[in-house]
C-alpha cells in the first residue's frame, strides 16, 4: 500500500506538508498534477487538481524523492500546500480515491524507515523524543542519541559478544578439538569487559529517563498549608483550586514546567491529616505514594501552626526541602530541630522569598541532572535489556568451563540478543507498536 498523511501540525498555518510514500507515489503525483514527475529533490511549483478533474485544489511546491534514497527508503513525495483545513481535506480526499492509497498510521513513515534499514531503533525513538521535546536539555539529549553514539556503543558490545560466541560454538561443533589456551583466556577477558561496560552504563542514576520524562516534584503537607497556591505560583496560572476550606484537594494535580531548561512534573497532593472520609483517605495515600516516588519533595507547612512530626518528619531527607509558608505571620523563632533541615521561609500570598525557593529547586535539579556523554539510556526498555544481558553474562561466566559450553553458549546468545533488541538488530516486532504509536500521524 501507498500511505499519505499531514506531516505538519494540525490547524491553520501558512504552509502544510502532506507526505506520500509507497510504490504508487509516482502515480499520485501524475494524477494530481496532470504532469510529468518533477526533477528529483528539486522544489517544483505545480497546480494540484482534484483527482480525474481539472478543478484546482491549490498551487504548491512538490518534492519527489525516489527510493531507496528517501526518508522511508521507498518512493516518496511531499506536497507543500497552503495550510487551511479545506485545502488539506481536499488533497487528502483526492489521494484517498487513488487505488492502493490509504491514510498512514501514527509513526508509520518512521516505522518504514526502520524496517527498510534507513535508521535503527534508537534513532527512531530519538526522533519521537525530539518531536516531543519541551526543554533545551530534552532537545540536547534527543540529538545526542540521534547522532548515533548510543547505537555505536551497544553495537560494539554486541559485536564483542558475537566474537566470543563464535569461539564457544566452534568448541561445541568440534568437541574433540581443544580450544587454544589464549582463546579461552580471551573469552573470559572479553565477557568480563562487557560486564564492566554494562554495569557502568547502568550506573547513571536514571538521568536519561528523568530528562525524557521530567523531574518529579511532589508538593506535600498538611491541609491548608498553601500547597495549591504554591503550585499555581510555580505554574504562573490557576492549576489548582485554592480555598480556605481544608481538604479541597482530594486527587493529585499535575502540571509540566520548564525550569531553566529542565523538564519538571509538579504534583499537588491531598493534605495530610487524620480523616475518616474514605475518599480523602485514598487521596492521602496517593499523596504519600507520590512523595515516595518523587525526585524532590516540597514539604509545605503553615508558619502559624508549625506541626512537623509523624509522617512529614519521616519524609525529610536529602531529596526534600521544608517550605514554611505564611512566614509573614510567624511570631517566634524556628526551633533548632527545624533549622537543621534544608528549609525556606516563604509567603505565597505576599510573594515573599519565592525566588529563594525556586533557586533551591534549581540547585536540586542541577545536582540530579548532572549529565555526561556517558548517559546512554533514555527509556525503561533500554535498561531492562541491559539488565537481562548482564544477568545472562553472569550466568555465562559461572558456566565458563569446557564441560558446560552447551549451556554457556545459550546464555551468551541471550546476552547478545538483548543487546541487539536495544538497537533493533534482532526481531523486535513485539515492541514496534508501542514505540511508533507514540508518534503523530505523518511522522
Swiss-Prot record:
Keywords: Cytoplasm, GTP-binding, Hydrolase, Magnesium, Metal-binding, Nucleotide-binding, Potassium, tRNA processing. Mg(2+) binds at residues 228, 249. Pfam families: MMR_HSR1, MnmE_helical, TrmE_N. One of its GO terms (cellular component) is cytoplasm. GO terms for biological process: tRNA methylation; tRNA wobble uridine modification. GO terms for molecular function: GTP binding; GTPase activity; metal ion binding. It is an enzyme of class 3 (hydrolase). Binds 1 potassium ion per subunit. It is found in: Cytoplasm. (6S)-5-formyl-5,6,7,8-tetrahydrofolate binds at residues 19, 78, 118, 443. Belongs to the TRAFAC class TrmE-Era-EngA-EngB-Septin-like GTPase superfamily. TrmE GTPase family. This is tRNA modification GTPase MnmE. The lineage of its organism: Bacteria, Pseudomonadati, Pseudomonadota, Alphaproteobacteria, Candidatus Pelagibacterales.
Amino acid at each position: 500500500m501507498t500511505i499519505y498523511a499531514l506531516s505538519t501540525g494540525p490547524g491553520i498555518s501558512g504552509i502544510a506538508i502532506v507526505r506520500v510514500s509507497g510504490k504508487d507515489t509516482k502515480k499520485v503525483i501524475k494524477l494530481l498534477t496532470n504532469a510529468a514527475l518533477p526533477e528529483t529533490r528539486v522544489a517544483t511549483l505545480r497546480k494540484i487538481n482534484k483527482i480525474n478533474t481539472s478543478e484546482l485544489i491549490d498551487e504548491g511546491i512538490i518534492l519527489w524523492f525516489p527510493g531507496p534514497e528517501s526518508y522511508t527508503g521507498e518512493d516518496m513525495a511531499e506536497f507543500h500546500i497552503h495550510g487551511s483545513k479545506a485545502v488539506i481535506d481536499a488533497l487528502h480526499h483526492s489521494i484517498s480515491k487513488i487505488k492502493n492509497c490509504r491514510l498512514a498510521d501514527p509513526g508509520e513513515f518512521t516505522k518504514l524507515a526502520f524496517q527498510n534499514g534507513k535508521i535503527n531503533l534508537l534513532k527512531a525513538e530519538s526522533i519521537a523524543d525530539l518531536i516531543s521535546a519541551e526543554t533545551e536539555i530534552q532537545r540536547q539529549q534527543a540529538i545526542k542519541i540521534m547522532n548515533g553514539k548510543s547505537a555505536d556503543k551497544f553495537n560494539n558490545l554486541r559485536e564483542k559478544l558475537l566474537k566470543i560466541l563464535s569461539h564457544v560454538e566452534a568448541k561445541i561443533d568440534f568437541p574433540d578439538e581443544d580450544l587454544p589456551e589464549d582463546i579461552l583466556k580471551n573469552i573470559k577477558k572479553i565477557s568480563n569487559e562487557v560486564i564492566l561496560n554494562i554495569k557502568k552504563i547502568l550506573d547513571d542514576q536514571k538521568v536519561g529517563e528523568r530528562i525524557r520524562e521530567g523531574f518529579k516534584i511532589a508538593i506535600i503537607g498538611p491541609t491548608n498549608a498553601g500547597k495549591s497556591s504554591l503550585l499555581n505560583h510555580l505554574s504562573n496560572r490557576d492549576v489548582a483550586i485554592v480555598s480556605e476550606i481544608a481538604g479541597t484537594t482530594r486527587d493529585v494535580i499535575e502540571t509540566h514546567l520548564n525550569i531553566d531548561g529542565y523538564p519538571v512534573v509538579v504534583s499537588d497532593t491531598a493534605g495530610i491529616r487524620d480523616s475518616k472520609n474514605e475518599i480523602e483517605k485514598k487521596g492521602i495515600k496517593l499523596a504519600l505514594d507520590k512523595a515516595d516516588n518523587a525526585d524532590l519533595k516540597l514539604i509545605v507547612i503553615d508558619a502559624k501552626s508549625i506541626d512537623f512530626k509523624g509522617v512529614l518528619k519521616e519524609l525529610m531527607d536529602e531529596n526534600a526541602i521544608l517550605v514554611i509558608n505564611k512566614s509573614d505571620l510567624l511570631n517566634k523563632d524556628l526551633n533548632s530541630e527545624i533549622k537543621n533541615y534544608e528549609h525556606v521561609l516563604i509567603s505565597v500570598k505576599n510573594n515573599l522569598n519565592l525566588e529563594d525557593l525556586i533557586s533551591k529547586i534549581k540547585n536540586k535539579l542541577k545536582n540530579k541532572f548532572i549529565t555526561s556523554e556517558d548517559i546512554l539510556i533514555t527509556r525503561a526498555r533500554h535498561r531492562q535489556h541491559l539488565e537481562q544481558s548482564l544477568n545472562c553474562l553472569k550466568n555465562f561466566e559461572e558456566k565458563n568451563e569446557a564441560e558446560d559450553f552447551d549451556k554457556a553458549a545459550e546464555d551468551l546468545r541471550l546476552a547478545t540478543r538483548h543487546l541487539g533488541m536495544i538497537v533493533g538488530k534482532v526481531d523486535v516486532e513485539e515492541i514496534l507498536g508501542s514505540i511508533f504509536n507514540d508518534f503523530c500521524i505523518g511522522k
